Amino acid sequence: MNKYITVKGARVHNLKNVDVTLPRDQMIVMTGLSGSGKSSLAFDTIYAEGQRRYVESLSSYARQFLGQMDKPDIDSIEGLSPAISIDQKTTSKNPRSTVGTVTEIHDYLRLLYARAGTPHCPKCGRVIQQQTIDQIVDQVMTLPERTKILILAPVVRGRKGEYTKLLEDMARRGYVRARIDGAIYELSDLPALNKNQKHTIEIVIDRLIVREDIHTRLTDSLETAMKLGEGLAVVSEVDGADTLYSQSYACPDCGVSIEEMAPRMFSFNNPYGACPVCSGLGVLMKIDPANILPDPTKSLNEGALRVTGWDSAEDGNGMARMYLDALSKKYGFSLDTPVGELPKEIIDILLYGTKNEKITVEYERDGRMGRFQSPFEGIVTNLERRYRETSSDAMKEVYESYMTNTPCPECGGRRLKKEALAVTVDGKNIAEVSEMSVRDAVRFFENIHLTEKERLIARLILKEVNSRLGFLRDVGLDYLTLSRSACTLSGGEAQRIRLATQIGSSLVGVLYILDEPSIGLHQHDNQKLLNTLRHLRDLGNTLIVVEHDEETMLASDYIVDVGPGAGVDGGHIVAAGTPAEIMANPASLTGAYLSGRRRVPMPDFRRSPSGWLTVRGARANNLRNITVKFPLGVVTCVTGLSGSGKSSLVNEILYKSLSRTLNRSKERPAAHDGIDGVEQLDKIIAIDQSPIGRTPRSNPATYTGLFDLIRDVFASTADAKTRGYKSNRFSFNVKGGRCEACSGDGIIRIEMHFLPDVYVPCDVCKGHRYNRETLEVRYKGKNIYEVLDMTCEEALEFFGALPRLAQKLQTMVDVGLGYVKLGQPSTQLSGGEAQRVKLATELSRRATGRTLYVLDEPTTGLHMADVEKLNEVIQRLADAGNSLVIIEHNLDVIKTADYVIDMGPEGGDRGGAVVAEGTPEEVAKVENSYTGQFLKDILAREGARPKR
């Protein structure tokens, strides 16, 4: 077998005809500056070709259901294995996905509870046994005399199919009627069933009227129904309720039956297990009164109602005003009273209506007064009705902005029916086990108490559960609970879960390509991740890891350094070899940092706070009712192990609460008592790595406001004035100046059914996006398309004489984006590049000194040299008097902070407290702070810094 993966002539994105040879069955790290081309080589070339070759081996029918990748622009790749990509962009957004379902642990738990669980009565809690026919007959006979009943045998329950043969067989066996999806049909005259829909089919065994003499006939009918329904029978009261009886399990005291103990009974994604109220989601979306009346200090006349249509009440006109006047007259309250001082009964009437009580509404039309009487629906009731009735996604989004998720009152957020929650294994139901952290679940299953029979049944199931839990623990995720929703996981957590799942599959001879698996992982847990990667390699797999973490690079077998610069300045292999060879290579920037020849510089001093923000009583998720002080006017790093409570404190409480107060957002902060010191700020801005736009029409020029200035420059030329062109003529988003053949995209998509869609340059504008007349207008010899095709560095030189343009372009260069083209589609920017575009936009604004910036792991995707540039930007924002709160694990950022708040001591239920706070020098002295111990080593090497 080939010992190497050989890539020849790779030209994807900015790769410059690259040749590279990679050793198989090794752990290879690809590194380089953000935008240097490492992801283009790893994901868009090697993975894309491996995946494409596999998909091409399938039939054309199968291919249309799989996302087929474009053939990368390469001469050849040899030695490829089947490729599996584990990146961070595929985090599930499905609210039904949990850590348990993603890792398949929940599937094994369902099987365990179905086969070895002990059922209890959901009403009285006693252990229940199988029900006899005599017990069922006795219960039916307690119905009122003369009650008409049907005895039904359920033969199909909530399954897809046509069931033609089954129904024909029932007719041959002498049965006359069936109830299909709730309606009774003659078996001789059945409707055609849709095979793609789920159906419930019950055969009518007998029709009876309850009286003393039906005892024998009822027994015979129930026995027949039980035989046909495989232990289940339905007694349906005509014009009444259905009761399901089971020969399996029923409570002799309460008469409550539990259906068959099947795995689907424990699935919240199946109607037979899901809570009927929340459909298995565990939460209900309800209109939150706090979103309707966000400011209790305002009166109704001052616009206290922040609902579309009602916020115009202060204008003195319109329907809203008429209803508010009528309500104030009817119930005797003033529209000038702050809503926080109005009686609860009045607030209830405003929100939920007058029920059937009518109010007199007066109106004016054509100068004449009129009146009508009508009940008032209530604002919340009205919004809920409109939400149910609308088919518009846009309107649904508007109504959902007033809603918040509240735990389901029926299941208490546990997602399952009460019957499923009444089944236990070793005294715990499936929800209680799912709510355990991985750490506690490992302990529970290692010491589980089962009978000899149950242990025999559960042996193989427990083996699978224990191994999967062990893999989650080994990748540093022992603080997660199995019930944790997958959409709340960070990119790094989701990636490590998929990594643990892959180890569980024990595949051999596979090429794994990973995207920064160390993201979100504290240095303390790094060794666990590295052991996992080594284990995957030792199984006989090849690992290509796109990574910037120093420890991961030093632990690898082979490093490929891509560069030397980013964008057009990158795309070459600068160095390739073992970590020792890279460190000795003078051409490798990565080698310079690894060897210590170059370091991210420390500041000369630590700034002193200009004020404080105090978060009181923070108790969201695992936070332990803590009070935390954030300094203002400085750079603060919030650190701690994964799951220690950093995001809960900063994103869920600090950011959402201040955003609601300062930005008037509808964000609902997590549980806390309050925040003191907000008056010292005028705005809060979150700078994350989400895309700056979702379509190719968005680019750095449009996001930063450069495009508006550039269009103004072109509109001010003599040629444009002669032609009567305004600045909108130079926009590719509106009709007029753009090419209408491609609507200003420059490319046209051609749909290929069994092949990937093909994008070809527009043959009218030749990919230039504008029509001929617009492109004839030039500034300093360049047209608008040629300007958008410039890099920021080229544009800075070109527009250097125009101060406003030059200032914005200079900040783009300062944050390390000089190589990015002005018109580069936002969809082609990496997360790190998108974040720096946002930082450049903020830097170019006039500083107020009263802004709080929140950054969540800004070093994601950044090389050590990029981190150095990022640090310079962060320090500039702080020098302008602004405050920064940064969630970070990267020690090169933490060591340059003015203040550190270290959360912990561990993750999950062992976290949620402040372990240490102060300058990096002060935190380094705290012995039980993991972050402090790492800082201690750095400060010993690079020297402590004084306070200013």
Name each model feature, range by range:
Residues M1-R948:
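Conserved phosphate-binding elements of NTP-dependent enzyme cores
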